[in-house]
Amino acid sequence: MQKLMGLVRRCVEDYNMIAPGETVAVGVSGGKDSLVLLQLLAGLRQYSNFKVEAVTIDMGLGMDYSGVRKMCEKLEVPYTIVETQIAPIIFDHRKEKNPCSMCAKMRRGALNQAILDRGIHKIALGHHYDDAVETFLMSLIYEGRISCFQPVTDLDRTGVIQIRPMLYIHEKTVDNFASRMELPVVENRCPVDKITKRAEIKDLVYQLSSTYPDLKERIFGAMQRYPLPEWEPKGRYKRPKDQE
């Protein structure tokens, strides 16, 4: 856990993500990524001067977050669940054929409003190293753009700042940590889970990596060396090596 907290701390410092005394909300979906982020940021509090809260947007899919609530109690992290009808609106009323974009937009809006209601302006999201590589390739292949989400995103119109402290941690490492710590991962009941464009890109990266083992490292490094907007680290970044 110390090694992973070190990677998070380095990412936070490289991109000036958290100011002293600040309160950061963690967007907790119940998936392994957000739970690992919550665990690591909660642990990092003892070394850095900031506070952590957890916020979940209940999509209206009947998911059980009782395990997450117990985890938050153990970590002494305030936990808020906001109940919505986002899933029924998208799948039952609108019957969207391509629901992912609208779902993400509605979920982000609900999450931003939830933290603002609590007087918080910074939200930590659980995107990791592999997510960044896959998002870059999705933009290139599906949209013809050189683009990716930013480590720190200032949503000017909302007053919310998004941060992604796990960008130096590989997905495999996240999976292993979640399993080892027996984190209370919530079953995803989304009807289109694992049949998205991201899943297609993940499979493509897996196939290409068998021939080009350093593919992900080269893409991630290129994003920083010839930086996309806001991707050049301010600190002394070193490329994450094999973490297992």
Describe the role of every protein-language-model region.
Residues A104-L116, V152-T158, V205, S209-Q224:
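Short, basic, helix/turn surface patches
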Residues D58-G60, Q85-A87, L155, Y168, ...:
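Short, solvent-exposed coil/turn elements at secondary-structure transition points
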Residues L183-E244:
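The feature marks non-catalytic terminal segments
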Residues M1-E134, Y142, K172-R180:
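ATP-dependent adenylation/nucleotidyltransferase module used to activate substrates
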Residues G6, R10, D14, K70, ...:
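Charged/polar, solvent-exposed surface patches and flexible loops
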Residues V77-N98, V160, A222, P229-D242:
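Mobile, glycine- and charge-enriched loop segments
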Residues K51-V52, D130-S210:
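Catalytic subdomain that performs nucleotidyl-dependent activation
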